[in-house]
A protein has these predicted regions:
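Long, compositionally biased stretches enriched for glycine and/or charged residues
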Residues: 186-441
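Glycine-rich phosphate-binding loop and adjoining beta1-alpha1-beta2 segment
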Residues: 25-62
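Redox-cofactor binding/interface segments in oxidoreductases and associated redox assembly factors
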Residues: 78, 84-85, 146
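Short acidic low-complexity segments
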Residues: 66-79
Length: 441
């Protein structure tokens, strides 16, 4: 590879400036020649705004990178070396429904967990598989770097249902946890290593090392301190019960609050929706503010306000991964990849989120073995939910969708699961043609 071509699907995303910043910072290691930002007709205006900011950022850098804006996905994919996906099918309006409808039934309404995660997968997976068909024809040797949520399910769907096996799923949660732990330990993050294992948005830190020495006991005490909670912009920092964390002997990710503190998180969500609206509505206002900033012809850097969007560290994760693949670095990064026995208690062809050695051949997972008993059951239950959801997304099988909804631990009963499923299917009908091509219930 000389002079890299990158195609970013969902290029009109508010996250794009962070990605551009990452490529500029790493140019010496990652000589990007072309960046193609792709979007759909509905995202045309945002693509223009964010694309022009990207061009100004590149111009300021003085680097010989060409930024192209297009609505023609196939043009962008032709001969690409890396394809990044950061799309949102149905935009924030769909997310708002994912969050609001379950709340009516006293069920968590969240973007990637419970009913919301199920429906985001149902909408997103067919679109990603369609992109992969184009990749098989136009850039069969490209790497697909996916950060479209739910990243784990999307990655697994690609692995199981397409010929694109050079796929890696990315999330900013593990890097956010490592940075958070470094802050608690008051050290530079480069000195901190976390043994990550689990699934996307269901990942645990099984051990924490400082300069190669385990500091797990110290960290377990730090993360139970009410003043030192690790969370994200989009998740309430409800305090963990100290004795629970000591018993778990693992660092939960912020999303685990939905499973271990379901009642409290539900109450918090309901209160927040009354005061501020759903998270989607909050994000929509943040995005409107960001795009107003992006329009400024004098702006030629990523604005710091982007971190409020909840996307901190995405650029670091994505650009570090691409740089390591390109340079065959052999460093360790947590990513979503094929299990292949890495976690003994999960199917081999499933996607898991684990530490991997990153090479030019892609991620080489570091063996985990069996997950500890206290975390194993929940991870297995979520994996059953994920696999059933993927099958529903691919086939449009109503019964599989209902089964997935019902076995998710955030649902109280099969009856409520069916009520939510039916209402959400109708609400998202235009993005779920696979369920409406035939009448069957």
């Amino acid at each position: 590879m000389t002079g890299i071509k990158i195609a970013t699907i969902g290029g009109g995303s508010s996250y794009t400036p962070e990605l551009i910043e990452g490529f500029i910072k790493r140019y010496d290691e990652l000589p990007v020649r072309e960046i193609w930002l792709v979007d759909i007709e509905a995202g045309k205006e945002k693509l223009e705004i964010v694309g022009n900011l990207a061009k100004r950022m590149v111009k300021k850098s003085g680097l010989p990178i060409e930024v192209h804006l297009t609505l023609d996905r196939r043009e962008a994919l032709k001969d690409a070396d890396f394809v990044t996906t950061q799309l949102r099918v149905g935009l924030l309006e769909a997310r708002a429904k994912d969050e609001a409808i379950p709340l009516k039934y006293d069920v968590i309404g969240q973007e990637t967990n419970g009913p919301g995660g199920l429906f985001k997968a149902l909408r997103t997976i067919p679109v990603i598989l369609d992109i992969c068909k184009d990749m098989e024809e136009l850039c069969p040797n490209a790497w697909l770097i996916n950060f479209a949520n739910p990243a784990g399910m999307v990655t697994e769907a690609v692995l199981r249902y397409t010929n694109i096996q050079r796929v890696v799923g990315l999330c900013n949660v593990p890097i956010g946890i490592r940075m958070g732990l470094a802050r608690l330990l008051e050290v530079d993050a480069s000195r901190v290593h976390v043994d990550f294992a689990g699934l996307n948005h269901m990942v645990y830190g099984l051990d924490v090392y400082l300069d190669g020495v385990s500091v797990m006991d110290r960290v377990l005490e730090l993360v139970t301190d009410p003043e030192k909670q690790i969370t994200m912009e989009n998740i309430a920092a409800l305090n963990w019960e100290p004795d629970f964390i000591r018993g778990l002997r693992a660092i939960p990710c912020p999303y685990h609050r939905y499973y271990y503190k379901t009642r409290e998180m539900l109450e918090e969500e309901k209160e927040a929706s009354v005061e501020k609206g759903t998270r989607a509505e909050v994000v929509k206002q943040l995005e409107n503010d960001l795009f107003e900033l992006y329009k400024d012809p004098n702006l030629d850097i990523k604005p710091p306000q982007l971190e409020k969007r909840g996307g901190a560290y995405y650029s670091d994760a994505a650009c570090s991964l691409i740089t390591s693949i390109y340079n065959n670095k052999g460093d360790i990064q947590p990513v979503n990849t094929r299990n292949n026995g890495t976690i003994a208690s999960l199917p081999h062809d499933s996607a898991v989120e684990v530490n991997c050695i990153i090479t030019k051949e892609g991620p080489k997972p570091i063996a985990v073995g069996d997950l500890p008993v206290p975390v194993r059951g929940l991870v297995q239950q979520i994996k059953s939910f994920e696999r059933t959801t993927i099958e529903a997304a691919v086939t449009g099988d109503y019964h599989k969708a209902l089964l997935a909804m019902t076995i998710n631990p955030l649902l109280p009963s099969d009856k409520v699961a069916k009520q939510i499923l039916d209402e959400m299917l109708e609400a998202h009908k235009e993005y779920l043609p696979q369920f409406f091509k035939k009448v069957e219930k």
